[in-house]
């Protein structure tokens, strides 16, 4: 009988007769095999099987891999052809792990004889079926590895860069260090320099007392600078450099008194007068921090409260204005909010926020000198927004109306403002007749035709350059 397991033959005549009658179990061997126990004693390749025993196939041999090539092959395994054997050997070599310099260094540094990880092969390692054996070098090699391990086990040296400079307060003008080198900023330094004038240089190391001026020299320098400022014999660049140098010396020596705040306030006003909003903002932040010191008298406190509100209006930081108002109430300084001028400044910020430009422009005339210097930095943009609102509300307006709303002194000044906005072609002459029959010529602005131009001008002027402050 032919079946999937090979050629099976009956051993005896009785067995053949029994099989012709259906066998001892009533089944014919000519039928397909239902289960292994149906067979009597059978022969498979001259090997006898006991009856009712399941004939089993030879177990499959393990896959040919790089670590069992030298093992004895099963006699039942078919020997591959010579050409196929060469290709198999080539594939086996490809599967072997590659040796890298890093892996070699790792394996050479291992204190042991056997590594079971086949992905790391050491320099001079010997392959085996169980793993890879590392051959250690001589005494020179061991000494070299020891020095290498010590070098990598050491912490970062003092000369390497670190992340300490992340702790620097770069919002402060007098940041002590611009590099990773740090020192204790709480060490009290007493200056010994007797030179009045000194240019500002950012500190990159510990301050040298021989290059720092003591308070008495700084007071003399302050009087010298004020004389030059009032006589207008010095440029703003020179004044700014000298004031920054004075502020640095005060900061390094940790001097916080009435003279310190006077230096910062004077520099802030001069910076406003010259349109230097960057230096003003640095001085203003330091002034507000000094006012929190209870030993310092709050002279001109309300003045710099107004400056802080106007600067927040410039940057459109209205939450800071609300926070400042709440802080004054919590600190028991609510009497400052009762001051008429301070109250007007806070109302001015509210009107700008809601877009009440009529009130905004009328109260602009009530501002003080340095307050106007601060608000002038963004006044042209507010005028442009106000003019856009007017043009969306009317089809045409008289230039006298524009003159009164924008606080211009004459029609010529109004016309110059419109010409700066590229609206010259929209200024028209119109003849009107009054109730007495008298005719006169007036200038009007065709607001309906200039709306698109105004919107384009607004988009171009939306960004304000205040030296990196916005």
From Swiss-Prot:
Sites of N-acetylmethionine modification: 1
Localization in the cell: Nucleus
Domain of life: Eukaryota
Assigned keywords, A-Z: Acetylation, Nucleus, Transcription, Transcription regulation
InterPro entries according to UniProt: PCI_dom, SAC3/GANP/THP3, SAC3/GANP/THP3_conserved
GO cellular component: euchromatin; nucleus
A Gene Ontology biological process term: mRNA splicing, via spliceosome
Entry keyword Acetylation: yes
Domain PCI span(s) in chain numbering: 276-450
Extent of Polar residues compositional bias: 1-12, 19-30, 154-165
Pfam families reported in the protein's UniProt record: SAC3_GANP
Residue ranges of the region described as Disordered: 1-31, 137-167
Matches recorded under PANTHER family: 80 KDA MCM3-ASSOCIATED PROTEIN, LEUKOCYTE RECEPTOR CLUSTER MEMBER 8
Biological role: Forms a complex with CSN12 that is recruited to transcribed genes and required for transcription elongation. May also be involved in pre-mRNA splicing.
Similarity comment: Belongs to the THP3 family.
Miscellaneous section: Present with 3360 molecules/cell in log phase SD medium.
Quaternary structure, from the entry: Interacts with CSN12 and SEM1.
Name used for this protein in its record: Protein THP3
Organism of provenance: Saccharomyces cerevisiae (strain ATCC 204508 / S288c) (Baker's yeast)
Lineage: Eukaryota, Fungi, Dikarya, Ascomycota, Saccharomycotina
């Amino acid at each position: 009988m032919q079946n999937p397991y090979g050629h099976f033959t009956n051993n005896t005549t009785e067995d053949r007769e029994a099989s012709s009658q259906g066998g001892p179990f009533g089944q014919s061997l000519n039928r397909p095999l239902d289960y292994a126990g149906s067979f009597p004693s059978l022969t498979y390749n001259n090997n006898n099987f006991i009856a009712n025993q399941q004939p089993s196939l030879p177990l499959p041999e393990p896959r040919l891999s790089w670590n069992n090539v030298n093992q004895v092959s099963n006699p039942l395994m078919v020997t591959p052809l010579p050409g196929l054997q060469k290709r198999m050997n080539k594939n086996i070599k490809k599967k072997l792990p590659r040796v890298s310099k890093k892996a070699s260094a790792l394996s050479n540094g291992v204190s042991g004889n056997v590594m079971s990880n086949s992905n790391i092969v050491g320099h001079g390692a010997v392959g085996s079926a169980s793993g890879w054996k590392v051959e250690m070098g001589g005494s020179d090699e061991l000494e070299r590895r020891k020095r290498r391990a010590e070098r990598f086990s050491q912490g970062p040296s003092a000369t390497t860069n670190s992340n300490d400079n992340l702790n620097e307060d770069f919002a402060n003008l007098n940041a002590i260090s611009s590099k990773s080198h740090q020192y204790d900023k709480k060490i009290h330094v007493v200056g010994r320099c007797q030179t009045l004038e000194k240019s500002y240089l950012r500190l990159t190391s510990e301050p040298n007392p021989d290059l720092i001026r003591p308070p008495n020299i700084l007071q003399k320098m302050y009087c010298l600078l004020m004389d030059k400022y009032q006589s207008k014999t010095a440029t703003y660049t020179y004044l700014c450099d000298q004031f920054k140098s004075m502020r640095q010396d005060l900061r390094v020596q940790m001097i916080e008194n009435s003279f310190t705040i006077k230096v910062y306030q004077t520099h802030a006003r001069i910076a406003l007068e010259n349109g230097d909003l960057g230096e003003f903002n640095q001085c203003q932040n330091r002034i507000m921090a000094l006012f929190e010191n209870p030993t310092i008298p709050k002279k001109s406190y309300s003045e710099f409260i107004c400056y802080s509100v106007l600067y927040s209006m410039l940057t459109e930081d209205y939450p800071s204005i609300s926070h400042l108002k709440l802080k004054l109430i919590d600190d028991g300084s609510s009497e400052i909010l009762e001051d008429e001028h301070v109250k007007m400044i806070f109302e001015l910020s509210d009107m700008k926020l809601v877009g009440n430009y009529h009130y905004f422009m009328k109260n602009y005339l009530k501002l003080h000198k340095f307050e106007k210097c601060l608000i002038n930095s963004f006044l042209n943009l507010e005028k442009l927004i106000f003019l856009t609102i007017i043009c969306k509300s009317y089809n045409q307006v008289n230039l006298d109306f524009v003159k009164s709303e924008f606080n211009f002194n004459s029609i010529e000044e109004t016309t110059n403002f419109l010409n700066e906005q590229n609206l010259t072609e929209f200024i028209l002459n119109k003849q009107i007749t009054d109730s007495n029959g008298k005719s006169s010529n007036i200038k009007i602005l065709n607001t309906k035709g200039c709306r698109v131009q105004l919107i384009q001008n607004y988009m171009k002027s939306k960004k304000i350059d205040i030296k990196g402050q916005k």
